[in-house]
């Protein structure tokens, strides 16, 4: 029994897709356990970029099983489109498995998402308007439609009529918006269900059988710990649990079967949307990092907010997600800076604190306390070992590991697979 969970330790966009793709080489099953098509990940293979939103990164290994678990909310339209995109690029998808217990995102979820966000005005959360939150709301309210329901014509029709009637009352009475028509949704989405039917199964059985057989299973999280609905910067969070604990709920695999948790982070910090960001940069350094790091959302295309590396955030993520190994990405983006900074603590009303407050009001008053390190001017994109890095870059990597309190297993100096350097195999000693 061998399993590794990959989680983002910041606000998403840390490079999880790349690391998952990298670790997939030694895995036999790769599974997603939460989120939806609001999460975008980019994988570079032979200098070609592939952008995925729902399908696990392991799909590019045709001999491995890729799983969309029960904790994922699935937009069938987006999924069919993504499958067509992969087929058009010559990628086979016969190795995909989709949980019959996963909940379905329908047009009324997306419409409600937009209406709710518009109604918030200046207090908007910054949702991607993909219907994720409303779909999870229906799931919690026990009125959601699952993949198993989508495949049954009579059941889907019955539940869609009930849900649509309720949502239309909401649209008309609360939001003064036009209702949606049953006939505009039913046939289209039932057909999507038929197109993905071949992939649908009880994925909990597949995952547990694989683990019991001693196979290597890799769990791929979406978003990041700081967007976790319980442990993140609430309410500026997603509607699911990206933390490693989300695996047990979102995949149907018990906690006793999780061996290691790899936390993925960038050598700086970024975030899309609104919410607290203590180390955010508003100067030329921030603009430089954004442009060199190509910090624009995979899903939204929006410019990401960027800032210095925050070890307070990272220690919080380590604690609540049980991180055992760290993967540090995008060190090359910091090349050329005379000085690089790491936030080591916060100043809250004149008091030094080393924890991440739950209160948004306190977070607004938190000022980062920085440790400054000398930068490096060398191009490090061809470095293939820690010793190959310039001394200042090497010291930066080591200091990150010390402040977070987790050993660094891999570090990356560029987006390519070959630019990921192994310091310690996460698959060993399990």
Swiss-Prot record:
Q: Which GO terms describe its biological process?
A: 'de novo' AMP biosynthetic process; IMP metabolic process
What EC designation does it have?
Answer: 6.3.4.4
Gene Ontology molecular function: any one: magnesium ion binding
Please share the entry's free-text remark on the cofactor: Binds 1 Mg(2+) ion per subunit.
> Where in or outside the cell is it found?
Cytoplasm
Q: Which InterPro entries does the annotation name? A: Adenylosuccin_syn_GTP-bd, Adenylosuccin_syn_Lys_AS, Adenylosuccinate_synth_dom1, Adenylosuccinate_synth_dom2, Adenylosuccinate_synth_dom3, Adenylosuccinate_synthetase, P-loop_NTPase
Cross-referenced PROSITE patterns: ADENYLOSUCCIN_SYN_1, ADENYLOSUCCIN_SYN_2
* Cofactor(s) needed for function: Mg(2+)
Q: What does this protein do?
A: Plays an important role in the de novo pathway of purine nucleotide biosynthesis. Catalyzes the first committed step in the biosynthesis of AMP from IMP.
**What name appears for this protein in its UniProt entry?**
Adenylosuccinate synthetase
The organism of origin for this protein? Streptococcus agalactiae serotype Ia (strain ATCC 27591 / A909 / CDC SS700)
């Amino acid at each position: 029994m061998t399993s590794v969970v990959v989680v983002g330790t910041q606000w998403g966009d840390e490079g999880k897709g790349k690391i998952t793709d990298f670790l997939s080489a030694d895995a036999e099953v790769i599974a997603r356990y939460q989120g939806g098509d609001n999460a975008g990940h980019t994988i570079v293979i032979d200098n070609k970029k592939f952008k995925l939103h729902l399908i696990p990164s392991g799909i590019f290994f045709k001999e491995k099983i890729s799983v969309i678990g029960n904790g994922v909310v699935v937009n069938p339209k987006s999924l069919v489109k993504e499958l067509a995109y992969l087929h058009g690029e010559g990628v086979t998808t016969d190795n995909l498995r989709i949980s019959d217990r996963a909940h379905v995102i329908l047009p009324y979820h997306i419409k409600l998402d937009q209406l709710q966000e518009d109604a918030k005005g200046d207090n908007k959360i910054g949702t991607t308007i993909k219907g994720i939150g409303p779909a999870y709301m229906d799931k919690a309210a026990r009125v959601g439609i699952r993949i198993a329901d989508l495949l049954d014509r009579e059941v889907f029709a019955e539940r869609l009529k009930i849900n649509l009637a309720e949502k239309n009352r909401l649209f008309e009475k609360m939001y003064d918006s036009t209702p949606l028509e049953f006939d505009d949704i039913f046939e289209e989405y039932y057909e999507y269900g038929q197109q993905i039917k071949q992939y649908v199964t009880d994925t909990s059985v597949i995952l547990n059988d694989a683990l019991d057989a001693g196979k290597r299973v890799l769990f791929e999280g979406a978003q990041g710990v700081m967007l976790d609905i319980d442990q993140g910067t609430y309410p500026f969070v997603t509607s699911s649990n990206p933390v490693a604990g989300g695996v047990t709920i979102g995949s149907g695999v018990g906690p006793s079967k999780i061996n290691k948790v790899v936390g993925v982070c960038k050598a700086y910090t970024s975030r899309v949307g609104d919410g607290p960001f203590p180390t955010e940069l508003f100067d030329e350094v921030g603009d430089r990092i954004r442009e060199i790091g190509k910090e624009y959302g995979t899903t939204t295309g929006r410019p990401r907010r960027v800032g210095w590396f925050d070890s307070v955030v990272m220690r919080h993520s380590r604690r609540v997600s049980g991180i055992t190994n760290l993967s540090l990405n995008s060190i090359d983006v910091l090349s050329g800076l005379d000085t690089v900074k790491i936030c080591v603590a916060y100043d809250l009303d004149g008091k030094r604190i080393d924890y991440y407050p739950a209160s948004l009001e306190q977070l607004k008053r938190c000022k980062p306390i920085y440790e400054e390190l000398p930068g490096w001017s060398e191009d490090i994109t061809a470095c293939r070992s820690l010793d190959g890095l310039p001394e200042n870059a090497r010291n930066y990597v080591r200091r990150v590991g010390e402040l977070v309190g987790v050993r660094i297993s891999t570090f990356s100096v560029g987006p390519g697979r070959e630019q990921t350097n192994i310091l310690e195999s996460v698959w060993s000693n399990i």
